[in-house]
């Protein structure tokens, strides 16, 4: 069994990964607050701030990090900037700074296709995707620094899956079929 650290385990991607691999590995998750996930053998790394997280990461051995943690806002306000910075840059850099001390062999990062908007390299769609683009550039530095670790940077377009109740196109189509309404789908 491998020791796997999953960040963003309360989000859609992270929670689904957690539930799918939980019985096959020793799973660690990070959390700043109480969690609703009730899995008996789950190891929760509670932390108050990023300095506290840094200390706690130095004390554990991890084979694989699956980094799904993020703060997402499509249209930001000035009040979102601190959360975007802490979640999308600082938190991830603390993980990267501890790769060697934790003994990490693989680092899997979830990014967004929006950081290459309309197929244009390094042109962000919004501030969120600009932060994800910045983190990808930071990740490149660590890829060069730690050649003994396998890095994967996954560019996700969208997600949908079992128990997904968000207002996604599939759910909207199903809802309109049930209500016998037409749905107009338009592309630009």
Features from the language model and the residues they span:
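N-terminal Rossmann NAD(P)H-binding glycine-rich loop of SDR-like oxidoreductase domains
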Residues: 3-23
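SDR active-site strand-loop-helix element
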Residues: 7, 30, 65-71, 107-113, ...
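NAD(P)-dependent short-chain dehydrogenase/reductase
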Residues: 127-129, 133, 137-188
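NAD(P)H-binding glycine-rich loop region in Rossmannoid oxidoreductase-like domains
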Residues: 47-87, 118-119
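Conserved glycine-rich Rossmann-like NAD(P)H-binding loop of the short-chain dehydrogenase/reductase
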Residues: 25-32
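Glycine-rich NAD(P)-binding loop of the Rossmann-fold in SDR/ketoreductase-type enzymes
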Residues: 83-91, 126, 130-133
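Conserved Rossmann-fold NAD(P)-dependent oxidoreductase catalytic core, especially the SDR/UDP-sugar
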Residues: 67, 93-128
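Short loop/helix-cap segments at secondary-structure boundaries that form the rim of catalytic
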Residues: 33-41
């Amino acid at each position: 069994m491998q020791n796997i650290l999953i960040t963003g385990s309360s989000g859609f991607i992270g929670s689904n990964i957690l539930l799918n691999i939980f019985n096959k590995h020793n799973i660690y998750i990070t959390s700043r607050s109480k969690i609703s996930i009730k899995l008996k053998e789950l190891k929760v790394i509670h932390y108050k701030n990023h300095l506290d997280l840094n200390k706690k990461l130095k004390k554990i051995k991890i084979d694989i990090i699956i980094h799904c943690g993020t703060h997402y806002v499509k249209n930001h306000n000035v009040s979102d900037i601190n959360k975007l910075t802490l979640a999308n840059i600082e938190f991830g850099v603390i993980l990267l700074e501890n790769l060697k001390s934790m003994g990490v062999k693989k680092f899997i990062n979830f990014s967004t296709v929006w950081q290459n908007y309309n197929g244009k390299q390094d042109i962000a769609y919004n501030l969120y995707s600009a932060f994800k683009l910045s983190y990808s550039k930071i990740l490149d530095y660590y890829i060069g620094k730690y050649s003994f670790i396998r890095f994967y940077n996954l560019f996700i377009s969208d997600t949908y899956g079992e128990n997904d109740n968000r207002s996604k196109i599939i759910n909207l189509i199903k809802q309109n079929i049930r209500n016998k309404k037409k749905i107009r789908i338009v592309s630009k």
